[in-house]
Design a protein with these regions (language model features):
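Short, cationic-aromatic polyanion-contact patches
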Residues: 264-286
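Interdomain hinge/linker at the junction between the two RecA-like core domains of SF2 helicases
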Residues: 2-59
Length: 288
């Protein structure tokens, strides 16, 4: 077992079963990057993104990620997510940039993505409190979710319950990561969840920003057959928002490189460039 939880093995096999970790965490990290050739980019911003129930899935945001990964890598990536998330992606028609997709529950023993050089793992799994509580009952341990203290990555089931949580969440995400590039040639993998074991090395981070309604209205104005130089107040009047709101939204577009910001007098002039503005939003990648 590449991602063992010894307490669970002892429960179902034999209490005398012993576990010995052969490699240190540092050695495992080196093996992961140097021997297996994995390069991980994490795009979750610290969120678990538990997608098993489908409630937290945001197809527009995730679809923007799929599109930008394909653009960055120059090839269509393969995708692993939960069955309910994939169903929503299909309904919202955001899978065009994806080469092939599969859900977590259909990966056991699968080599479908063994030769894929680019992969995405979107969201993590959580089978519900009942799953953790059943393991607790089997082990005769008290297990209770303390959501007053935290949710997502801060969710706490107590000492034993947290071992079960990490087994179904972090370990399942890592197993999904290991589906890609199994032919020894490695892979670039984008992990859209914070649920990874702490020892797993992350080479870069991605930050996803979906444009709000105000920014979309400004994009519409800037793309019309009007001037290519705008003052903040003129944009605000066209869109029907305050100059402060216009300045904030224009600043986001400038930070993304879609327009240029020039200081003139006591205000700013915004210059429309030849860069095509993505109507969905922006994904920015940075080295960790």
């Amino acid at each position: 077992d590449g991602t063992p939880t010894p307490d669970l093995w002892q429960l179902v096999v034999d209490t005398r079963l012993s576990h010995e970790q052969v490699l240190s965490d540092g050695e495992r990290a080196d093996y992961f990057t140097q021997a297996l050739g994995y390069n991980l980019v994490q795009t979750a911003g610290g969120f678990a993104y538990s997608y098993s129930g489908g409630q937290g899935v945001k197809p527009v945001r995730d679809g923007l990620l799929f599109k930008e990964v394909a653009k960055r890598e120059g090839t269509a990536p393969a995708l692993i997510s939960t069955a309910k998330a994939i169903s929503q992606y299909e309904q919202e028609d955001v899978l065009d940039p994806i080469d092939a997709h599969q859900h977590y529950g259909n990966l056991k023993g699968s080599n479908q993505f063994a030769s894929e050089r680019v992969g995405i793992v979107a969201g993590s799994r959580h089978y519900g409190d009942d799953y953790v509580e059943r393991w607790g009952a089997l082990a005769e341990k008290s297990v209770e979710a303390d959501r007053d203290e935290g949710r997502g990555m801060d969710l706490d089931y107590g000492e034993f319950g947290n071992k079960v949580l990490h087994h179904m969440r972090e370990h399942e995400v890592l197993q999904a990561v290991l589906r890609f590039g199994r032919d020894g040639r490695g892979a670039n993998i984008y992990v859209h969840t914070a649920a990874l074991p702490e020892w797993v090395p992350v080479e870069a981070e991605g930050h996803i920003h979906v444009w709000g309604k105000g920014t979309l209205e400004i994009i519409r104005v800037l793309e019309c057959d009007g001037p290519n130089r705008w003052r903040t107040r003129d944009v605000a009047e066209e869109v029907g928002i305050t100059p402060r709101q216009a300045r904030t939204n224009l600043g986001q577009l400038a930070d993304a490189g879609y327009i240029e910001k020039e200081k003139e007098g006591r205000g700013f002039t915004w210059v429309v460039t030849d860069e095509t503005i993505d109507r969905l939003g922006q994904v920015e990648f940075r080295s960790s």
